[in-house]
């Protein structure tokens, strides 16, 4: 079986979860099963719940992981909703979310993620109603400016939005290739990433509501308050990493009083656990040589030891 995607930070993920023995492991973003396959092999007593919203990825992974069929349950769902769909919440001992786009999705022409694509789609869930085509051809100039500024951190967001609106007034923009030509190939000041790459990333975030989905998922976990459970999240965008970092920082604090208050009034017992990774884990030099797409990957991990489930 040809594997269409190389899992990022595979060794680092295995290291984070190396001490897991029994219970359930939730792979929130199964993709093509690389992380789950390695963990299934190394943890024979763990049971797995594998989730993905991409039907193609799910079908592939069912075949790839067929030897473990008696230990794994598959769910098609966005990862922000998966906690509502599982029955073993109290037995969760490990949770992994790799929230990047797979190589298969990037390289698949019809999915419209790549700047070289003949399509303009970018939906991770093909059943979603809004695609990049609708956003590029129907959003107002102000809405497009906001997307490029907030999600792409592009200084000339207004200019890019203006160019798009001008071109679509002549004819609808139908392909990623066409959009790429409109945006241009220049770099964003001194950043290594091209302006078009940042703009495409911003559009993808809007199409899939990626930041909202991440916040919703972390909010559900905060309400769930797992016990004796390790959470690891791999992100590929600075905005996503910032969200994860801030949630972990919040969860690790005992005191949740306003910083302006001189003395603690909350009981000083609100910590959900400890941050495992003092700083984000990045790909090694060896991995970068094998898989250049791992260059943006950042993993953070948190241990929920909320034994009293306050």
Swiss-Prot record:
It is found in: Cytoplasm. Pfam families: Methyltransf_5. SUPFAM superfamilies: Putative methyltransferase TM0872, insert domain, S-adenosyl-L-methionine-dependent methyltransferases. S-adenosyl-L-methionine binds at residues 33-35, 52, 79, 98, 105. GO terms for cellular component: cytoplasm. InterPro entries: RsmH, SAM-dep_MeTrfase_MraW_recog, SAM-dependent_MTases_sf. Gene3D superfamilies: Putative methyltransferase TM0872, insert domain (1.10.150.170), Vaccinia Virus protein VP39 (3.40.50.150). GO terms for molecular function: rRNA (cytosine-N4-)-methyltransferase activity. Its main location: cytoplasm. Keywords: Cytoplasm, Methyltransferase, rRNA processing, S-adenosyl-L-methionine, Transferase. It catalyses: cytidine(1402) in 16S rRNA + S-adenosyl-L-methionine = N(4)-methylcytidine(1402) in 16S rRNA + S-adenosyl-L-homocysteine + H(+). Specifically methylates the N4 position of cytidine in position 1402 (C1402) of 16S rRNA. NCBIfam families: 16S rRNA (cytosine(1402)-N(4))-methyltransferase RsmH. Belongs to the methyltransferase superfamily. RsmH family. This is Ribosomal RNA small subunit methyltransferase H. It comes from Campylobacter jejuni subsp. jejuni serotype O:6 (strain 81116 / NCTC 11828).
